[in-house]
Amino acid sequence: MCCRYFIEDTTEMQTIIGDMLRSSLVQKWNALSPIKTCGEISPTDIVPVIASNLSRQRAVFPMKWGFTGKTLLMNARVETAAVKPTFREAWKSHRCIVPASYYFEWEHLINQNGRKKTGDKYAIQPQGNNTTWLCGLYRFENDLPFFVVLTREPGEQIRFIHDRMPLILPEHLVNEWINPDADPAELVKAAVTDVIAEKAI
């Protein structure tokens, strides 16, 4: 699961944000709600997201986190996204990358009564990286783009925290992931699992 992440004010993120500001969608979204470009990000926030433009070139667009419906959908399981009606079209051709500095996860524990409880909050990111490239899917609702973050089984280092983690790719595969002609099932095999987790203050 992934329900929070953080954007730090780094040179790389500033470049991504600068690219986003060229999008005509900025004005449309700002008329509804401010775009968040730093700090802790939550579902329903509007944030910078990398995707292909109409010319199939890499671009950055403001998108809102969560598919709307009976309940807000903020995540999609990578194991079933290709077949679930809600996600299968986006899986084929509307893939995106959500740039983050790191994501947050809370320990899921079992108390003495066998009930689940929430433990410590952790900040998690790939080993040796300042930017975390979260894989997502997007769709249009009322002519505006909305996205979900894909999740997968966790790596061994963080299995004690949660039974899911976001699908993360190395930077060199970002352009391939957003390419509508690429095979996402093949790219998933290159997912990053070597991550570090530190307790968040």
Positions of the model-derived regions?
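Short linear sequence motif anchored by a di-proline
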Residues: 1-201
